[in-house]
C-alpha cells in the first residue's frame, strides 16, 4: 500500500493497493482500526462507552480499477468486536466469479443476486449501509455502486471472538485471479459514518 498518491486521485490523497504473486486466487486484506484497540483516529474508547451505542454504519469510498480483466474480487468490510461477539459486514464485488455482489455469512460467501458492474480504468463509487439489529443480528441493508442502489435486507447471526477483542475496523481486500496477475487499484475518500 502506498498512501498520499496524487494521481489518479479525486482528493489528491489516494492510496494505491497492489496484488500479485504466484499462488492463484491469493488475496491481500488491508484493515484500519477506527475505534477501540489500536485506533488510528484517536478513539480508543477505553471506558467501553462508545461502541455499545453504535448500531448503524455507512461505508463510503471511491475506488479506481486499473484493469477489470484482472480484478477477480474487491471486498469492502465493516467489522465490530465487543463482549466476545464478532460482527462482520463483508461485501465483495465478485467481478470475475459470479459477477454479483456477495456477502459473507457463517457458512461462507453467498450471492445477493445484485450485479457488480465495475467501470474499467475509471473511478467507481461504493456506499454500503449496514445495521446491528436489537437482537444482535447483522443486517446487510443496501449496496450502491456508481449511483445504482440495491436493497439487500438480509440478516445473519454474529460469531464468537476472544473477549479481549474490542473495536470497529474498516477493511479493503483485493483477490487475485486464476493467474494471480499483478493488479493495482486505488482508494480515495474512504469514510465510515456510524451512529
PLM segments and residue spans:
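Surface-exposed loop/edge segments in extracytoplasmic proteins
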Residues: 85-89, 110-113, 148-154
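Short tryptophan-centered beta-strand motifs in secreted/extracellular beta-sheet-rich domains
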Residues: 61, 122-134, 141-143
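Flexible glycan-contacting loops in extracellular carbohydrate-active proteins
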Residues: 152-186
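Short, aromatic/His-centered strand-loop micro-motif at the edge of beta-sheets
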Residues: 104-127
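Secretory/extracellular carbohydrate-interaction modules
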Residues: 2, 9-102, 194
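Extracellular beta-strand elements of beta-rich domains used
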Residues: 126, 188-192
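Surface-exposed coil/turn segments at beta-strand junctions on protein surfaces, enriched
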Residues: 52-54, 69, 118-121, 161-163, ...
Amino acid at each position: 500500500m502506498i498512501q498520499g498518491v496524487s494521481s489518479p486521485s479525486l482528493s489528491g490523497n489516494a492510496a494505491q493497493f497492489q496484488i500479485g504473486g504466484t499462488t492463484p486466487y491469493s488475496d491481500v486484506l488491508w484493515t484500519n482500526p477506527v475505534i477501540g484497540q489500536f485506533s488510528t483516529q484517536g478513539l480508543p474508547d477505553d471506558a467501553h462507552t462508545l461502541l455499545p451505542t453504535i448500531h448503524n454504519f455507512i461505508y463510503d469510498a471511491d475506488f479506481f480499477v486499473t484493469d477489470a480483466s484482472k480484478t477477480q474480487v474487491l471486498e469492502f468490510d465493516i467489522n465490530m468486536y465487543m463482549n466476545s461477539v464478532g460482527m462482520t459486514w463483508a461485501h465483495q464485488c465478485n467481478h470475475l466469479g459470479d459477477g454479483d455482489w456477495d456477502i459473507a455469512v457463517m457458512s461462507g460467501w453467498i450471492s445477493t443476486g445484485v450485479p457488480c458492474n465495475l467501470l474499467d480504468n475509471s473511478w467507481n463509487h461504493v456506499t454500503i449501509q449496514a445495521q446491528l439489529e436489537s437482537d444482535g443480528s447483522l443486517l446487510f441493508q443496501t449496496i450502491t455502486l456508481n449511483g445504482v442502489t440495491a436493497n439487500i435486507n438480509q440478516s445473519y447471526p454474529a460469531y464468537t471472538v476472544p473477549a479481549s477483542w474490542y473495536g470497529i475496523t474498516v477493511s479493503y481486500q483485493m483477490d487475485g485471479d486464476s493467474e494471480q496477475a499483478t493488479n493495482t487499484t486505488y482508494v480515495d475518500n474512504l469514510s465510515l459514518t456510524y451512529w
